Amino acid sequence: MADGITYGIIFPFRQSVTGKYLALSEETNEEIRSNLIFLLLTRKGSRYYLPDFGTRLYEYIFEPLDGETFDSIKTEIQDSVDKYIPNLTIQNITIEPYVDSEPSLGELPSEQFDIPVYRVPGANTEEYTAKVKIEYTDNTNAFGSREFVIINI
């Protein structure tokens, strides 16, 4: 584009103001945030010409939520960002496990739904996940503003 502004598609995808096209980012911080989310949620090996692009976060879904797994997740994120988003500096990665205290679909009476609700006998009803908070600085910003992204795995 001739005006010197770089444009990128905002992730997660949404419609533009006119509703005809995908929304584009015109601000650097918005574009970097979209690029970071896109990088984190892309599985390694899913891009034909860039097989190393992305992360292996999906592989950690059923791993134990302990320090060793958290260190592996941090390393995975840091290595991918260093390689594919060089204008971003990660300040801190915080990972914390939590248990969803809301009732799961299997605990609710099936009369409330039009579809049958199934429950696996003997299965644990608590769903364990981890919350990953990534604090980063945009190196292209003259003021060095800090931003963060939170994803759940």
Identify the role of each PLM range.
Residues 1-75, 79, 91-92, 96-153:
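Immediate N-terminus of the mature polypeptide
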